[in-house]
C-alpha cells in the first residue's frame, strides 16, 4: 500500500471502548460479575482507547498532513491489565467494588480452547489469548499530537458513553 503512490497512514488502535461493539459489551457484562475467573488471572497488559478518540483522530488524520507511511498507535492514557480494566468498568459503570479475580491456569485452559472458541463465538480462542499475551500498550505521543490533547484513560470512559 505504501508503495502505491498514494499517501498512506496507518492507525493501530488498542482495545477499543465503544458502546455497541461486541468486545466492549462483553467486557461491560463481565464487569457486572462479583467474581471473575480469568486466564492467568487477567494479567495481560492493555491500554484501552475510547472509540470517540479513535474517530476524532481518524478525522484529523484525513485533514492533517502526516508523513507518508506514518503509524499512529491509538491507545488510552492509562496502562492497565485486563483484570484492572474490568475492575475499572465495574467501579465506574456499575458503581460496585472491584471483583474478586481467580486465576485460571493457562495449562488447564489450552485443551479446552476448541470448545471455548465455539461457545464464546471466538472471544476465547487460541488467537484471542495470543493477542492478549502479546499485550496492547503503546506510547501515546503521536496519538496525542493528532488529537491535539491527551487521550482519555479507561477511568474516564464512563463520562462519554
Regions found by a protein language model. Name each.
Residues 1-20, 29:
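Conserved beta-loop-beta element that borders a ligand/cofactor-binding pocket
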Residues 22-23, 40-63, 70-73:
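Substrate-positioning beta->alpha
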Residues 27-39:
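A short C-terminal helix-loop "cap" of Rossmann-like NAD(P)-dependent dehydrogenase/epimerase domains
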Residues 45-52, 72-92, 103-114, 150-153:
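Substrate-binding strand-loop-helix patch
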Residues 55-62, 86-89, 154, 158-161:
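Hydrophobic "lid"/C-terminal helical patch
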Residues 61-76, 96-101, 126:
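Core catalytic loop region at the nicotinamide-binding pocket of NAD(P)H-dependent oxidoreductases
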Residues 90-134:
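Terminal hydrophobic/aromatic helix or amphipathic segment near a protein terminus
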Residues 134-161:
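Amphipathic terminal alpha-helices
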Amino acid at each position: 500500500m505504501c508503495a502505491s503512490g498514494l499517501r498512506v497512514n496507518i492507525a493501530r488502535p488498542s482495545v477499543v471502548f465503544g458502546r455497541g461493539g461486541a468486545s466492549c459489551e462483553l467486557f461491560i457484562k463481565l464487569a457486572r460479575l462479583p467474581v471473575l475467573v480469568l486466564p492467568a488471572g487477567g494479567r495481560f497488559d492493555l491500554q484501552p482507547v475510547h472509540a470517540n478518540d479513535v474517530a476524532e483522530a481518524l478525522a484529523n488524520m484525513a485533514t492533517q498532513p502526516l508523513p507518508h507511511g506514518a503509524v499512529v498507535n491509538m491507545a488510552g492514557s492509562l496502562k492497565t491489565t485486563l483484570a484492572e480494566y474490568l475492575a475499572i468498568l465495574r467501579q465506574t459503570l456499575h458503581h460496585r467494588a472491584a471483583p474478586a479475580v481467580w486465576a485460571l491456569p493457562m495449562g488447564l485452559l489450552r485443551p479446552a480452547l476448541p470448545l471455548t472458541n465455539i461457545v464464546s463465538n471466538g472471544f476465547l480462542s487460541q488467537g484471542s489469548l495470543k493477542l492478549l499475551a502479546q499485550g496492547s500498550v503503546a506510547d501515546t505521543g503521536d496519538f496525542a499530537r493528532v488529537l491535539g490533547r491527551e487521550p482519555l484513560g479507561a477511568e474516564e470512559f464512563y463520562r462519554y458513553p
